[in-house]
UniProtKB/Swiss-Prot annotation:
It comes from the Bacteria. Signal peptide: none annotated. The keyword Transferase applies. Pathway: Pyrimidine metabolism; UMP biosynthesis via de novo pathway; (S)-dihydroorotate from bicarbonate: step 2/3. Heterododecamer (2C3:3R2) of six catalytic PyrB chains organized as two trimers (C3), and six regulatory PyrI chains organized as three dimers (R2). Its EC number is 2.1.3.2. Belongs to the aspartate/ornithine carbamoyltransferase superfamily. ATCase family. Carbamoyl phosphate binds at residues 91-92, 141, 171, 174, 300-301. L-aspartate binds at residues 119, 204, 259. One of its GO terms (cellular component) is cytosol. This is Aspartate carbamoyltransferase catalytic subunit.
């Protein structure tokens, strides 16, 4: 049993207008203080380019912490970070935990299956009780789009909220670590052609990446996939849509592959995984259509032989494992920035 964005227990709330690219609950910008500083990180949509660049610049300073003998800085000493994962996660939850620990915070991972929400307590009651325990920062993953917004709206004034993925809406720290990875290898966003390939309809990563890429001035963003897996509204965002993988990959500098999110699909949107790979899988032959120095990315988890060939995933143009490494520094930067901004 999960808790919907109204605080009631039951099935996850449906995303507002799921076939469209934008979501109805995004009113104003609750992420920013009155002074325009970042209090919560809920979505990349609506963030000024200056804040996105500030996060990336700060992350660059934290990358070197990994190479130190003592991999800690005292930035969040005395602060309490609560990881509230209402959806299963390994990679994201672990990197947030590592990032908070390296900032010297006290970290608590809430066991959702054993928590009061599984016994009928509302989401807001749970949040209020945790706030009373003097939590400073909530890292939230939830099946319902908008749940982190609800928490940010109702939590205690001193508490900060970071969205670690909500429904199919947004995954802002993944989008930011993807931007950091691209900047690390390509430097200048204003000269790039970036392709996002696969199940874009159900992907919160794709939404965050597209908002980040357009915010940072990428002149050409391509969405490539079958018609059944592309949302409406992409063209209005300035995204070029391709329904042929070979055509879409021609000359691109960055390829971001996405997995099929079968757990979010209703009905038969696709043939078998084998047939999908034949048409939409990234093989060495298809990679050769991109720019010679193109990089290949994937937010994980990765399904070899479905959306990507092992030769590509493990090849010299793949930067997938580096995304994971950079993710720790990016999440350190986000937590350090939001916890230092209060209104």
């Amino acid at each position: 049993m999960t808790t919907d964005t109204t605080g009631r227990t039951g099935k996850p709330a449906a995303a507002a207008s799921p076939e469209r690219f934008r979501y109805g609950f995004l009113k104003g910008n609750p992420q920013l203080t009155k002074n325009g500083e970042l209090k919560h990180l809920l979505s990349i949509e609506g963030l000024p380019r200056s804040i996105v660049n500030h996060i990336l610049d700060t992350a660059e300073q934290f990358v070197s912490v990994t190479d130190r003998e003592v991999k800690k800085v005292p930035l969040l000493r005395g602060k309490s970070v609560f990881n509230l994962f209402f959806e299963n996660s390994t990679r994201t939850r672990t990197t947030f935990e590592i990032a908070a620990t390296r900032l010297s915070a006290d970290v608590l991972n809430l066991n959702i299956n054993a928590s009061s929400t599984s016994k009928g307590e509302s989401l807001l009651d749970t949040i209020n009780n945790l706030s009373a325990m003097h939590a400073d920062l909530f890292v939230v993953r939830h099946a319902s789009s908008g749940a982190p917004y609800l928490i940010a709206e109702h939590c205690a004034p001193h508490v900060h909220v970071i969205n670690a993925g909500d429904g199919r809406h947004a995954h802002p720290t993944q989008g930011l670590l993807d931007m950091y990875t691209i900047r690390h290898y390509k430097r200048d966003f204003t000269k790039l052609r970036v392709a996002i390939v696969g199940d874009i309809l159900h992907s919160r990563v794709a939404r965050s990446d597209i908002h980040a890429l357009t915010t940072l001035g990428v002149p050409e963003v391509r969405a490539i996939g079958p018609r059944t897996l592309l949302p409406g509204g992409l063209e209005q965002m300035g995204v070029k849509v391709f329904h042929n993988l070979d055509e879409g990959l021609k000359g691109v500098d960055v390829i971001i592959m996405l997995r099929l999110q079968n757990e979010r699909m209703s009905g038969a949107l696709l043939p078998s995984a084998q047939e999908y790979f034949k048409t939409w899988g990234l093989t060495p032959e298809r990679l050769a259509l991109a720019a010679p120095d193109a990089i290949v990315m994937h937010p994980g988890p990765m399904n070899r032989g479905v959306e990507i060939d092992s030769q590509v995933a493990d090849g010299p143009q793949s930067v997938i494992l580096n995304q994971v490494t950079f993710g720790i520094a990016v999440r350190m930067a986000v937590m350090g920035i939001v916890a230092g901004n209060s209104d």
